[in-house]
Amino acid sequence: MSLPESAPLSDVRAMRVALSEARKAAEEGEVPVGAALFQGRRLLWADHNRREGLHDPTAHAEILCLRHGAKKLGGWRLHGCVLYVTLEPCPMCAGALIMSRLSRCVYGAPDPGAGCCGSIYDLPADPALHSDTRWTAGILESECASLLRGFFRHGSLSKR
């Protein structure tokens, strides 16, 4: 999928792709986090949390996008790519995003419980990592947060 030439990729448009994935996660009983990886206007991969369905603790939306995007590009370095994710990345995902050499990460809602891009820790700012990845927070924040609140309010994780 690519966006039409006449339609510049905006953070809001791209985050809507990630939100669509987050809704799929909720329908599957997964924590509703979605992500979309773009190279320019080209969508490389969009996915959502699949930990429950895959029985894989690393099957976060961000990790799945990195894996599939790197495979499509034929290499693990994701220079020039931007990942949009509905929730602030956790320690595992923030580390993987930095190590992938991603150009930019854009996230919607902060995660006061596990967010590692400023909420509980700021991994990207750690000088030991020498990260060039740029980070943008708060795109469609209320929509992203509302989806998560609704999911947890209705006890959608009863099978955990």
Question: Which ranges hold each PLM region?
Answer:
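Zinc-dependent deaminase
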Residues: 1-25, 89-160
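Small-residue (primarily alanine) positions within well-ordered alpha-helices
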Residues: 18, 22-25, 35, 61, ...
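A cytosolic small-molecule/anion-sensing beta-strand core signal
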Residues: 39-40, 67, 79
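Short beta->alpha transition motifs characteristic of CBS
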Residues: 44-51, 134
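A short, polar/charged loop-to-alpha-helix boundary motif
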Residues: 53-63
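Immediate flanking context of iron-sulfur cluster ligation sites
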Residues: 75-88
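Glycine/small-residue-rich phosphate/adenosyl-binding loop
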Residues: 45, 62, 66-71
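Short beta-strand scaffold segments in enzyme catalytic cores
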Residues: 33-41
